[in-house]
Amino acid sequence: MALSRGTSLILHEDPEKTPSPNSCEVPGIMSNTTPRPTPDLTLAPLPAHGVALAPALHPALSPDPEGVSGPVPNDISNPNASGAATPSSIQINTADTDDQSLDHTPKPNLAGTLCPDSQPVPSLSSTQATVLSPENSIKPLSEDIPKSFSSKVFGLGQSNSNPSRPEPNLYIRALSREALVRSHTISRQSSQTPLLLPSNTSLDRLHSGNISKVNLGRAQNSNEAITLTSHTIFASVSKEALSASWNTGSKGSVNVTSNSQPRSGLNVTVTHASHVSLIPGSSEGLSLHSSAQVPNSTLSPSSCMTLIMGSESLSMDSSFVVTDTSTLTLSSHRDYSEDNSIRTMPLEENLGKWDSLQGVTAFRSPPEGTSEDAKANESEKRDHDNDTALVENIISYQKNQDEVEVTGEKETTVKMMMRKIQEEPLDSLLSPARRQAMEILAQLSHTKPILSVRERVELVNTCVRSVFSLPSVQAMQEKDESKAEVIQTLYHQTLDSLQKLLNALFIEDPTPAGLKSILEPLGPWMNSGKVHERARAVNSNVSVLNYTLVTLPFFVSSGFPTLGLLLGRLLLRIGDPDEEIGREALDGITILYTILDLQKRTKNKEEINKKELYETNKRFLGPYNPASPCQNILRVIAEFGDFLGPQQVRDLLLAALEGLKDISETQGKDSIEMMQLASEVMLSSVLEWYRHRALEVIPEIMQGIYMQLSHIQEPRAREVALLPISFLASSFMTEVVVALLMCPLPLDSNGAEMWRQLILRKPSCDVRDLLDLLLTSLKEKPVTKKGRASIVPLAAASGLCELLSVNSCVGRVRRIYPQLLLALLIQVHYHIGLNLPSRVAPRKDSKDDIQPPLFVPVRWMVKVVKTLLLKMGCSYESAFLEEQGGWELMGQAESHYRAVSLLARAMVHYSCQELCRILYLLIPLLERGDERHKITATAFFVELFRMEQVRRIPEEYSLGRMVEGLSHRDPIMKVLSIRGLVILARRSEKMTKVQGLLPSMVKSLKNMDGVLVMEAVHDLKTIFKGQAKKLTDNSVYIEMLQTLLPHFIDARETVRTSCINTYGKVVKKLRMPRTQAMEEQLTSTLMPLLFIIQEGNAKVSQHFPLEFHTAGIFFLLVCRNV
């Protein structure tokens, strides 16, 4: 079985498709930034000024040859005019075979880039090729092509020990278009340019070509030789081929003999090899990497062979013979993750101690003809190239393993590179490690599987923080003046590598979600207090937008991802004190507008020319005005109206708030004022023109304002941040109030200021409507229909408390003072023992080791009641409750009604002007609500019977209500009804009717708690004193004695003594004649009392000697008559 090299595959560019950008830097196709040459290419001459570092991805678009912002005309000058020996074509061949183990698999062109024909094209010579030109036209091969190109072919191959399973194409090497156009020296023998250029190689290019897959473990004949052309880049040997002999001939072929019988020893011989890699099949294996340095080697130095073996295949008698090779690179999976050091070792030294090595890097001199700039960077290039090769070899190419293993390998490598980036210092830039790691990550992005959104965000955050946090170039150069030039070069290389990584990540997942995961980590850096950090962030954002416009692989019907935040942050930067930042931000907005306009026109199936569209939009949005950047802000906001929905308006407002955060003290006063002005203009204009679109997102806007206020301390900035509240409340009062009710409780200074903003700033809302909304919320139960606790009433009470602190609001509150007072008193009763959802706001001044005071909702509600009384001028009433302990009683379940009665009694005593209004409001409240509602209303109502105005109330609402209360199932309602009747009995016209109700009142005391009995009996004494002589029926007294008797043994001493005292007084009220029934009842009540006396209760005898004496005499009289 042999692989013939006679078949050629010709690659050409499809002009009908949008090519996929490579991983090199994208020039400012739509920006004013001049493309910088990539300094990482050490073996190719630098291009002339303006030569594209990325393909023009639209027939009408190409990089600006003058470095000017925006698309450029199609007539681009030939790069060869600069003197660079740039080839006009290149031919790439792949081997062809009839064996079933060789699988030519055409891969789809993912991004419309260099697309090979779907079928291999036989070629008897190397004269057929396609010309890659800026005009994307196909031309015949010219005569002036260098001979090295006309006679040199490159094989593209991939191995797979299991051809039946699709492969993720891990680490298939390729040449980017830039390398094909610029780096013609890669085809020369003894060239030192590696086939895989880490800084400008796009791994996804090979996905569109035919891939040769060779399964060396499927040979039927053990003696059959498998011939691989030197142009097959990768050949994987599965662990079934445990005995193999590798060698290379002068013709550049690799002969492999497979033995179907596995054995523990593996002997490998490699001669004239430029690149040999032994990749372990498990974490305990070793990696062997060889690089040729012989100038006159007959084998192309760009060839590569890879052995994949499981750890079980390695044994003590395994041997590896490598000849005509200068340097070996050895690494171990197990050790590499712990130690990233790289050491070199000449091949002549002893190779037996592999475990002591983790990597050997081949250092090579630059070839003749290399440019001076490339020579200056050769040292860093060598480090980078070999680091890249090392990481490549660490990644296993085991195609016969499960996809889960492949996923873990990529994840491990990504984490390794991220850790390497994190280890780099943030205050200096003296090592290319940061840049190299990002370039390796960029190439990893072309492998499967793609990163998840979370992983991509973490990766971007890590890289962006490492680069953006660096000091300014000037600061780093001043710190180390001797390396100023090196720092300058390395700095630009690092920024370029970061941009390449961002672009590569976008190509990895060219979806709205993928773009969002890249843009979101960049956004906050645009609001940095340091100029150089803002400049880097704006530049990166604009570059990503530029790249998106050129590529534009997706269409979003619902709008651009994170449009509001991105637009808002760029708008703020238009007003940046640094004019260059402002200018670039406006250019980024123009690109963003063009993307949105392009998608809109694409949806309408319109013919589009990106170049013309961009230029039109640039004129449409106007030039940058450094003297008055706010004019640019206003213009942009006005013109973006077609693309702003509710979510975008919300994000715009929140982005404006980000610009108000406390800025570094190093910023001058003028700079701070400029940035605050930009935020204010942005907020005001958005609210003025698009506030009607924010209706459905008002809760999110209010929450965002609350969160941002914690980071804004400057008074003027806080005023600006609170503007949306008053603006939105003037049009959407209900929605704003409902949103504010969701603020964490208890209200901190930020939440309180948001409530006050409703009436402090213009345009202010209607205070009358505001108070009515709060009153409505206060009338709700703090329990939902599903039985869950609701925070709305307590939040409404808190908001009312803050509004009462504004003097201008007090007069408006008086209008609904009675309703507010009654609603608050009822809410106090509802909140007793209520556990609300966990929405307690953390206190700024609370330390970690100090627990904040426990937030008790009922106490907060009582505080609001007290505040309302004081603001309404009821200071005497408040003081009265303070003296009587009423405020404490109000928060307790068993005594809440007593505190309400005390308050009503105090208001009557001090002649509160609002009592009549309260009286008439209470009448309908007595019929509504549940038990707590009725108890609170009744407790206040009965005390108002002391007023003269009660005569105006119909009897059915006074006396009739009290009579109904005597039969109520709640004992408290019975006690309150008795109190009401007693108060009514003080009026002569009511005395007779109340006297007739005395038996019912006494009877209602049965089976009642001793404390309530004491309270009711205390009220009944008034009636007994006034009507004692008129009562001839002793049955009422006997009923009272029967009621008091069970409480003689009450555990509470106050209850016992009070009932016995009352008992003695009732006995004295008895009158002759006595009936048999009365004597029996009297005897039954006196006997337990005598037992108490006999037990020698000194306290009882001491407190009530007269009552006991009277009762004893009466008892003797009864016995004598019997």
Swiss-Prot record:
- Disulfide pattern: none
Return the HEAT repeat spans.
913-950, 992-1029, 1035-1072, 1080-1117
Residues bearing attached sugar chains per UniProt: N200, N210, N255, N267, N296, N541, N546
Query: Region Disordered: what ranges?
Result: 1-144, 183-203, 246-265, 363-385
Glycoprotein among keywords: yes
Biased composition (Low complexity) is annotated at 33-65
What is the name attached to this protein's record? Answer: Maestro heat-like repeat-containing protein family member 7
Origin organism of this chain?
Answer: Rattus norvegicus
